[in-house]
Amino acid sequence: MPIHNKVLSNDHFRKHWQMRVRTWFNQPARKIRRRNNRIEKAAKVFPRPIATLKPVVRGSTIRYNMKVRAGRGFTLEELKAAGLTAQYARTIGIAVDTRRVNKTQQSLTLNTQRLKNYQSKLVLFPRKVNAPKKGEATKEEVAKAVQTLKPFTVKSAIAVTCEQTPRKPTEAEKKFSAYATLKAADSKAKTVGIRRKAAEIKAAKAAEK
């Protein structure tokens, strides 16, 4: 079978192809096996969460940047703003990605707050129960600790608020094209250097005259 968005080829079946049809009769059993593996993993890592904390990121390119999704890991800048180091963050269930870079203040603020919320709910078990260090949980907090059995969601991290009451759109809003505006802004940003250079050449020629 071809991969990606390509034309499906005309298959010429020969050599008893009916005996080579791929089947998935083990699908129900695999579902049970995955469920049992999740239960075993939760028991093995108890009391830690079954998944690491991931940042909220936007997909690359104009096609996908309208939607948010879970990223690979938090940037060093986000960890620093939350008062954490990369080495320590990995030990308390926080994913770290040293390659990703914050390009907007919005993403930095959002993920920093996500880290702080995680830390506020985090219960660090002390190595020595009778002598807990600063930041580690007491005996009472350890007794009340609950394991998180679901991955940390991304959608819940962004609060959707409506500041305006419902109203009818104006004629200007109906004619407004968000895609065309973004496309024009993107094109303008790409050609800003070329247009500046052309303007300088034109001004220099005008000065010579």
UniProtKB/Swiss-Prot annotation:
GO terms for molecular function: RNA binding; structural constituent of ribosome. One of its GO terms (biological process) is translation. Component of the ribosome, a large ribonucleoprotein complex responsible for the synthesis of proteins in the cell. The small ribosomal subunit (SSU) binds messenger RNAs (mRNAs) and translates the encoded message by selecting cognate aminoacyl-transfer RNA (tRNA) molecules. The large subunit (LSU) contains the ribosomal catalytic site termed the peptidyl transferase center (PTC), which catalyzes the formation of peptide bonds, thereby polymerizing the amino acids delivered by tRNAs into a polypeptide chain. The keyword Protein biosynthesis does not apply. It holds the Pfam family Ribosomal_L13e. It is found in: Cytoplasm. InterPro entries: Ribosomal_eL13, Ribosomal_eL13_CS. The keyword Protein biosynthesis does not apply. One of its GO terms (cellular component) is extracellular matrix. Its main location: cytoplasm. This is Large ribosomal subunit protein eL13. Component of the 60S large ribosomal subunit (LSU). Keywords: Cytoplasm, Ribonucleoprotein, Ribosomal protein.
